């Protein structure tokens, strides 16, 4: 088989110039994004930047009003939502949580709980779980469906820093073991997974993209968070060659002001030392 054919077969989702228009405005526009099997792509950006809209287009919940989205035939998606509506006053075990959205094979449930590191909590009430344990339960529920693409919407919300490290490490291990693609929304603009292959910064459009840089392994950092933290979390240095004004217009690097930067080219810095406009963020 030709190499190009193999590469095309590995593509799970491909978006080209995709956008969603609602109530007279673009929620997000001009999105080019590809997720391949075994690849981790992380979306970052402020609230309202179009991260969730982009994910919904990727998995087919929303159809693009312009551009195109192509998915692998019979693509299986495992989805961990940002919020789950649960009546916390009712008794609900982790096992029952796993089957809330459909019947699952008991063996697959057990394997998924084992993979998420919470097999010992199968009969525990969800009300008693910590933030990290609950996120692992949601992750296990997605894994039980043996997805080709794992979609994680802010998977470390409500989790302390140590828990973030453990969850990101788990996500990386799941990718390595199953070969699934991962599309992840990060709640933090500055700290992303070191294992991420591509970081895409959104603000109604793609501002910039690149690979994350590992957190500096200073003695102080290792002392505070442990040696593994530097291998799991990374700082993504990026720069913008334009400025978003309060009225929604955009000031370009040469001083000209335009209505939007949809068609404007954005330089991407893979190294924080490139370009005078680079900003280093340290979580």
From Swiss-Prot:
Residues 272-283 have a biased composition (Gly residues). Pfam families: ABC_tran (PF00005). Its main location: membrane. The keyword Zinc-finger does not apply. One of its GO terms (cellular component) is plasma membrane. The gene is znuC. One of its GO terms (biological process) is response to zinc ion. Part of the ABC transporter complex ZnuABC involved in zinc import. Responsible for energy coupling to the transport system. Residues 13-228 form the ABC transporter domain. This is Zinc import ATP-binding protein ZnuC. It is a peripheral membrane protein. InterPro entries: AAA+_ATPase, ABC_transporter-like_ATP-bd, ABC_transporter-like_CS, Metal_Ion_Import_ABC, P-loop_NTPase.
